[in-house]
């Protein structure tokens, strides 16, 4: 019996699911006549009817046909778009928690309206995840028109929003945003010191657009929030001076394929001579090695106008695959500082990790997850294994007739671009629209200059001009249009032959000062007339374009991922339109240089072909496909590795975040503190009495340690004798019981003292604040230690040990040690903090926990969310009713301020680069100087003393 691959095995039963989806779509279509007869008010009233039926026990599955029919009709009335049969199938697949595989141009954005509307009825919030802010804002405004017509609230999460704006956005029925923004909000919620600062209200249902890009490509790079660590080092500038003196293949070697460098002995000698040191690799100089490596990487592997641009004295990363500038984002591990030194701009400080999570583990938080993409079949096994998601192929609405031509390979880049310009000019003259995909800003500008020389009118869409991208894309399908795009993948806008009427109409209305969010009534009133006018204008042009052969997509280079190439091709031939595509390649392309470029060059040399004569051979196409497969496999291994290591952290993170949320929500921590006292005193006693005989116990040292912890009221000499008499017979158990009783009695006296100073119940408030402060600090230290552990764990392989197993074992031990340290420091703080009654304040200072009563007052003043699932502040208010409110108290020396000057690091749209985004500008003078190793040793050597403290449209 032939064996089945895992991918094929996972697709068994797909046919049954597709048949089920067809039956559902038929049922929805059968309800259309009934829904069409409803007035706008009756259609809108259906939402409340569905909510009432849901509260009365009907399930969302039972409501699906009617809800889909209502949303479908609303789409037609509001935006003049009616869901096709296959889009209803896709919407149902999403509702059931699957990935709907829908080809480019099949209307994934419109499809998402159906499951988003249905699941919003439950009132627990729906998150629609896109790849960038532009698409999130566009989709929330565009599809939000339909949802608002039906009485639902929609909102969007954008970078740069304040916590109050984010909280309001999450309170909406449907929230749009990027994967990075959703993930960072989750991490920030677990760093806040006040319930009022929480923004998210749970993880109910998410629809991920371009799911393969977000859950596969970008999953290689974890989300990281960092804070200032090292002060800017003089060594960045020093090594930026030395790097140009070093010669490639003489002083160092570069592996472009693996993106690594290696310094030769000659290079080490030159550096030692420049720095005036004897040995670069001796212990005192070891930190300099990383500065050297980064300086060479900045020189060889990071190219200006390809990987980054310099604007206003700042190095800004360019997403190589999408061509977008990622303003404010930064490379980690000192790489960004090395590039800043190379470009002679201001060098900003390094950071250390404060909170982190992988996209895999973030999206696993959702009760139900689904996604849409045009290319998920090849990753079916990974999607099932990691996210438990099935991939359902949705048929196309019309058959695809695009012609995909074979690749043309030229010997040099110059010859390739000359041929590209000739091809484009020829097609432009006959009126065929052309879309050219490039891989960098530099190449798009080079082509632009060539077209200008030849007198070809064209538009450029790249990292420097993507603000105008909607208008450029809307006009890219007009006859004779030539559009140069850094990369089309993820742009999310269809190129419609003759022009995109919806986008053109939207732009026209915005020029009149109308907006679907701020002036919805005027916008909707003007929409129909403007849209009809635009449609009439583009129809005649669309017929001309079809006669000329449809949209011609021309790729100037192959990308690492076949999926990116397919997405570029997929811009042509949408909805059964004619179209054509071809890739122009050269032996100088990066992919060719990384894989078998030399072999291909020798073949072309033997053929003795002129530079301007291309070859079109299956062998070359196979070599390219093989190279892409190798890169995809490498990236898959990286993703698996990232996930394996994060699994260790995920269990620890879950424990810490659950504990933290309980403290924030005002849970009575008295029992937990009493247990901490028991555990800490027991550990002290067990450590001192491990020898077994009273004569061997160092009770003086034990008492000295206990005195730093709490005011001990027992003299050890009374227990075991004063030295002159014979030692009294006492067991370790008896000693432990005596000291435990003494410690708990001391805590009772401490509680009475605190309540006397700041009012009844103040001890509970102090417990919460101390535990929160210590928990946060110990968790940050633990993340720092885990980072350090992971940096060097790979070396264990040299000792024939599995690095992952070693990381798991040592990580577990370190987490246990962190928890013990947390208990000890918390107990010390609670006994020794100097507490006084604080003067009444109109508002709580940031980062200071509020009392139960003030939490209730604040929560009751907060706007109620639109959906039944309450915000955390409201839950706390409900729990706090009837609780006695202590006076405000102030604890001297307690660090309960939140971290400042944060940096946010996450994946770019292609998932390739580790990037960071500087948070809101905040002063922070607490960054310690020194290398990571020095900071680590300093932290470890701290003394114990410091630890203690509308109308219906015509059809």
Curated annotation (Swiss-Prot):
InterPro entries on file: Helicase_ATP-bd, Helicase_C-like, P-loop_NTPase, SecA, SecA_DEAD, SecA_motor_DEAD, SecA_preprotein_X-link_dom, SecA_SF2_C
Composition-biased stretches (Basic residues): 943-955
GO cellular component terms, semicolon-separated: cell envelope Sec protein transport complex; cytosol; plasma membrane
SMART domains to which the protein is assigned, alphabetical: SecA_DEAD, SecA_PP_bind
PROSITE patterns with a match to the protein in the record: SECA_MOTOR_DEAD
Gene Ontology terms for molecular function: ATP binding; protein-exporting ATPase activity
A matching Pfam family: SecA_DEAD
Family of this protein: Belongs to the SecA family.
Protein name: Protein translocase subunit SecA
The encoding gene: secA
């Amino acid at each position: 019996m032939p064996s089945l691959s895992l991918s094929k095995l996972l697709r068994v039963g797909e046919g049954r699911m597709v048949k089920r989806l067809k039956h559902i779509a038929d049922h929805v279509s059968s309800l259309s006549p009934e829904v069409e007869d409803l007035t706008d008010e009756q259609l809108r009233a259906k939402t409340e009817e569905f909510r009432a039926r849901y509260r009365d026990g009907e399930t969302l599955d039972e409501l699906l046909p009617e809800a889909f029919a209502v949303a479908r009709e609303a789409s037609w009335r509001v935006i003049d778009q009616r869901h096709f049969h296959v889009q209803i199938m896709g919407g149902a697949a999403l509702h059931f928690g699957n990935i709907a595989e829908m080809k480019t141009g099949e209307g994934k954005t419109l499809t998402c309206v159906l499951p988003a509307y249905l699941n919003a009825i439950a009132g627990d919030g729906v998150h629609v995840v896109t790849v960038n802010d532009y698409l999130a804002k566009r989709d929330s405004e565009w599809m939000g028109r339909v949802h608002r017509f039906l009485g639902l609230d929609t909102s969007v999460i954008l970078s740069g929003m304040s916590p109050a704006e984010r909280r309001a956005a999450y309170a909406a029925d449907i929230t749009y945003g990027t994967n990075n923004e959703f993930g960072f909000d989750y991490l920030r919620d677990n760093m806040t010191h006040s319930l009022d600062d929480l923004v998210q209200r749970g993880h109910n249902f998410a629809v991920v657009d371009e799911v393969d890009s977000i859950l596969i490509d970008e999953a290689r790079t974890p989300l990281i929030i960092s804070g200032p660590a090292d002060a800017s080092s003089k060594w960045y500038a020093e090594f930026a001076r030395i790097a140009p003196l070093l010669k490639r293949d003489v002083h160092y070697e570069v592996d472009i394929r693996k993106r690594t460098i290696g310094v030769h002995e000659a290079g080490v000698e030159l550096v030692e001579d420049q720095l005036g040191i004897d040995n670069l690799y001796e212990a005192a100089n070891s930190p300099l090695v990383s500065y050297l490596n980064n300086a060479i990487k900045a020189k060889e592997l990071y190219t200006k106008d390809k990987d980054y641009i310099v604007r206003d004295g700042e190095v800004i990363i360019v997403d190589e695959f999408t061509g977008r500038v990622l303003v404010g984002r930064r490379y980690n591990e000192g790489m960004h500082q090395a590039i800043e030194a190379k470009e002679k701009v201001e060098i900003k400080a390094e950071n250390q990790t404060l909170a982190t999570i992988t996209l895999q583990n973030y999206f696993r938080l959702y009760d139900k997850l689904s996604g849409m993409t045009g290319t998920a079949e090849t990753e079916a096994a990974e999607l099932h294994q990691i996210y438990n998601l099935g991939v359902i192929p949705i048929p196309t609405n019309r058959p695809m007739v695009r012609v995909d031509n074979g690749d043309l390979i030229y010997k040099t880049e110059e010859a390739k671009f000359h041929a590209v310009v000739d091809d484009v000019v020829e097609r432009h003259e006959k009126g065929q629209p052309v879309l050219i995909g490039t891989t960098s800003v530099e190449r798009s500008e080079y082509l632009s200059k060539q077209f200008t020389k030849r007198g070809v009118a064209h538009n450029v869409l790249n990292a420097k001009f993507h603000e105008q991208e909607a208008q450029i894309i809307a006009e890219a399908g007009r006859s004779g249009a030539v559009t140069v795009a850094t990369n089309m993948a993820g742009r999310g806008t269809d190129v419609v032959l003759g022009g995109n009427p919806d986008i053109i109409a939207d732009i026209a209305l915005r020029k009149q000062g109308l907006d679907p969010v701020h002036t919805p009534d005027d916008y909707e009133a003007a929409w129909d007339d403007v849209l009809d006018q635009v449609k009439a204008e583009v129809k005649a042009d669309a017929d001309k374009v079809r006669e000329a052969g449809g949209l011609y997509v021309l790729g100037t280079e192959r990308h690492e991922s076949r999926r990116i190439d397919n997405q570029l091709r997929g811009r042509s031939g949408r909805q059964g339109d004619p179209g054509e595509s071809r890739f122009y390649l050269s032996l100088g392309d990066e992919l060719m240089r990384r894989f078998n470029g030399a072999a291909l060059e020798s073949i072309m040399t033997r053929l003795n072909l002129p530079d301007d004569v291309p070859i079109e051979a299956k062998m070359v196409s196979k070599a390219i496909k093989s190279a892409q497969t190798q890169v995809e496999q490498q990236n898959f291994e990286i993703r698996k590795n990232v996930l394996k290591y994060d699994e260790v952290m995920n269990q620890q993170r879950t424990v810490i975040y659950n504990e933290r949320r309980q403290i924030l929500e005002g849970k009575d921590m008295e029992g937990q503190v009493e247990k901490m006292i028991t555990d800490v005193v027991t550990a002290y006693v067990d450590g001192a009495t491990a020898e077994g005989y009273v004569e061997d116990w160092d009770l003086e040292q034990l008492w000295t340690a206990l005195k730093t912890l709490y005011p001990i009221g027992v003299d050890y000499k009374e227990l075991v004798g004063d030295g002159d008499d014979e030692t009294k017979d006492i067991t370790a158990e008896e000693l432990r019981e005596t000291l435990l009783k003494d410690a708990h009695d001391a805590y009772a006296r401490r509680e009475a003292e605190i309540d006397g100073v700041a009012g009844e119940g103040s001890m509970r408030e102090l417990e919460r604040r101390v535990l929160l402060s210590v928990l946060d600090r110990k968790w940050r230290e633990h993340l720092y230690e885990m980072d350090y552990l992971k940096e060097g764990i790979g070396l264990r392989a040299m000792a024939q040990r599995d690095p992952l197993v070693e990381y798991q074992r040592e990580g577990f031990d370190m987490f246990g040690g962190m928890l013990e340290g947390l208990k000890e420091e918390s107990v010390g703080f609670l006994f020794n903090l100097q507490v006084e009654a604080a003067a009444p304040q109109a508002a709580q200072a940031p980062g200071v926990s509020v009392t139960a009563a003030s939490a209730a007052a604040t929560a009751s003043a907060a706007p109620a969310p639109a959906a039944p699932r309450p915000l955390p502040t409201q839950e706390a208010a409900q729990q706090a009713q009837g609780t006695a409110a202590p006076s405000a108290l102030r604890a001297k020396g307690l660090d309960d301020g939140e971290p400042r000057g944060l940096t946010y690091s996450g994946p770019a749209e292609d998932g390739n680069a580790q990037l960071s985004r500087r948070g809101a500008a905040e002063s922070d003078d607490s960054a310690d100087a020194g290398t990571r190793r020095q900071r680590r040793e300093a932290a470890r050597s701290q003394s114990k003393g410091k630890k203690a403290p509308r109308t219906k449209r015509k059809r």
